[in-house]
């Protein structure tokens, strides 16, 4: 029984044919994936980015971005620091010096990664989606100034924003995608009146192949995330989006190429 239990999942993985007809690019979600128990490095760290960009056929990474109380940008996913680090509070209410002292509670205890010009140079090895987190419109001027100070190459860097207000803030400066909880949240008026909208970012289970094709027909792109299993990755690749933000980067690359 033990051999059979090992053999059946292997057959399933091998049975997921490579999508040679797909044009989808593979990106690392939060660099090397969120909530991965056997991850080599913690998500959104410099080490995770270096690893992801070293993999052949990796198109780049998606990383989560928050701004601290001093206007410095950081790669950090969670709303609270204590959920994954030896710090307390939130990035938005913390000083730069305080965040520089922090470490993740991971095997390698990586430091938190500030989005500096040095890290931007590393990210230039691929393309990057900056997923803007916790960014209220109240601090929009500081947020925009912090991003502009990095002199980002807009051929290499795009933004993912959670609200239409932030889309309007960034649309004339950066290629910008709107994050959606449901496909039905996408308003027809936005599609019709905003040619600057590059596309949407949405969970795999929330969009169909037909909806992806509809967006393509009006020159909008789709970024799909929350895919980590062989079945989920194959399902997402079958929809042929612009990019797949995968939580299992090596598996997604293997199934795609």
Where are these regions (language model features)?
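Bacterial N-terminal signal peptides
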Residues: 5-13
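Phosphate-group recognition and catalysis centered on beta-loop-alpha active-site segments
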Residues: 16-257
């Amino acid at each position: 029984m033990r051999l059979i239990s090992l053999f059946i999942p292997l057959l399933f993985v091998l049975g997921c044919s490579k999508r040679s007809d797909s044009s989808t690019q593979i990106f690392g979600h939060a660099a090397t994936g969120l909530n991965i128990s056997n991850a080599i490095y913690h998500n959104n760290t410099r080490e995770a980015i270096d690893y992801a960009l070293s993999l052949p056929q990796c198109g780049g990474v998606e990383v989560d971005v928050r701004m601290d109380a001093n206007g410095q940008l950081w790669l950090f996913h969670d709303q609270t620091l204590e959920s994954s680090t030896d710090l307390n509070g939130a990035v938005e209410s913390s000083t730069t010096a305080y965040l520089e002292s922090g470490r993740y509670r991971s095997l390698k205890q990586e430091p938190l990664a500030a989005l500096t010009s040095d890290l931007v140079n590393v990210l230039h090895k691929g393309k990057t989606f900056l997923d803007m987190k916790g960014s209220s419109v109240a601090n929009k001027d500081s947020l925009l100034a912090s991003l502009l100070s990095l002199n980002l190459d807009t051929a290499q860097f795009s933004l993912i924003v959670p609200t239409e207000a932030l889309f309007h803030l960034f649309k004339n400066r950066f290629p910008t995608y709107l994050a959606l909880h449901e496909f039905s949240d996408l308003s027809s008026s936005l599609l019709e009146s905003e040619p600057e909208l590059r596309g949407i970012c949405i969970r795999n289970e929330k969009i169909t192949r037909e909806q992806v094709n509809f967006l393509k027909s009006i020159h909008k792109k789709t970024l799909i995330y929350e895919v980590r299993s062989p079945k989920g990755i194959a399902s997402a690749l079958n929809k042929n989006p612009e990019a797949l933000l995968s939580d299992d980067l090596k598996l997604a690359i293997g199934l795609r190429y």
